């Protein structure tokens, strides 16, 4: 049952990160693509914006995919946690803790869950379990 719980966590978080990466990279799911995301990154001081958007989008898309299928799970968790750490520092941190105030509550939750999965392991239903 634990492995099923870990699978559900990995799937929900991994697929969500993949979708956010696709928003940044391709403009899918209501996103703004590299140009729009890059412009916003520039506006918050993350320069060069297009390069930062590419790095963030790839981290979310690739990290999310790896996390969902449980392949190279510690690396995937690091990609997710790193993205959330930067989001906390650059965007949400100054707004305080609560998500209702655009704070870092949700980002911290995702960061801790990703790191926790890296520590616990991805479970039986993961590519890592087949290989390692």
Spell out what each predicted region is.
Residues 1-36, 42-43, 47-58, 62, ...:
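Extended, low-polarity transmembrane helix blocks
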């Amino acid at each position: 049952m634990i492995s099923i719980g870990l699978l559900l966590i990995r799937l929900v978080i991994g697929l969500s990160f993949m979708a956010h990466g696709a928003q940044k990279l391709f403009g899918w799911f209501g996103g703004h693509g590299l140009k729009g995301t890059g412009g916003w990154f520039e506006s918050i001081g993350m320069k060069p914006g297009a390069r930062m958007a590419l790095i963030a989008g790839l981290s979310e898309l690739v990290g999310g995919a790896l996390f969902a299928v449980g392949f190279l799970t510690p690396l995937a968790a690091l990609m997710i946690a790193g993205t959330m750490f930067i989001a906390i520092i650059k965007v949400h941190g100054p707004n305080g803790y609560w998500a209702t105030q655009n704070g870092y509550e949700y980002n911290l939750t995702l960061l801790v869950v990703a790191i926790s999965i890296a520590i616990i392991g991805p479970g039986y239903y993961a590519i890592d379990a087949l290989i390692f």
